[in-house]
Amino acid sequence: MYQTLQAAYAAKRKARRFAVQGIYEWQMSHNPVHEIEARTRAENAMHKVDLNYYHELLTQVIAQHEDLDALLIPVLDREIDALDGVELATLRLGAYELRDHLEIPYRVVLDEAIELAKHFGGADSHKYINGVLDRLSSTLRSAEKQQAK
């Protein structure tokens, strides 16, 4: 049971990694999402990835990026256009999970986003990601945050 749970968490973590890369690619190139997904699946070993979650994150974050940006803008300390591309992709993914995946504890969403930023982002981008998503979670997950205190 424990190993099955660990494997499921690892598969979701890998899905997030591939999704943030695909979101970043879309932001830079505006290539069609289905092309990004097809290329990613063809060029990578995806057998230990939660493919359904990867597909959902990639397609839904891109499809809903304007709504996600509207959630992020009030908690940013700079213009959204001034964000690094990796930071923006990570923030969009984190905002999507905070808003649409209430079954995932907000602290897990923050931790996963921090790990993505450490892996793909600049030296201190993980601190920025943490601060922005923590502020956003105060709005989207206020009851959950109050219970956690």
Curated annotation (Swiss-Prot):
Keyword Plastid: no
Function in brief: Involved in transcription antitermination. Required for transcription of ribosomal RNA (rRNA) genes. Binds specifically to the boxA antiterminator sequence of the ribosomal RNA (rrn) operons.
Protein name: Transcription antitermination protein NusB
Transmembrane segments: none
HAMAP family: NusB
NCBIfam families documented for this protein: nusB
Gene giving rise to this polypeptide: nusB
Upper taxonomic lineage: Bacteria, Pseudomonadati, Pseudomonadota, Gammaproteobacteria, Moraxellales
Record-stated family: Belongs to the NusB family.
Annotated organism of origin: Acinetobacter baumannii (strain SDF)
GO biological process: DNA-templated transcription termination; transcription antitermination
InterPro entries referenced in this protein's UniProt entry, alphabetically: NusB-like_sf (IPR035926), NusB_fam (IPR011605), NusB_RsmB_TIM44 (IPR006027)
Superkingdom of the source species: Bacteria
PANTHER family: ANTITERMINATION NUSB DOMAIN-CONTAINING PROTEIN, N UTILIZATION SUBSTANCE PROTEIN B-RELATED
Keywords: RNA-binding, Transcription, Transcription antitermination, Transcription regulation
A GO molecular-function annotation: RNA binding
GO CC, alphabetical: cytosol
Keyword field contains Transcription regulation: yes
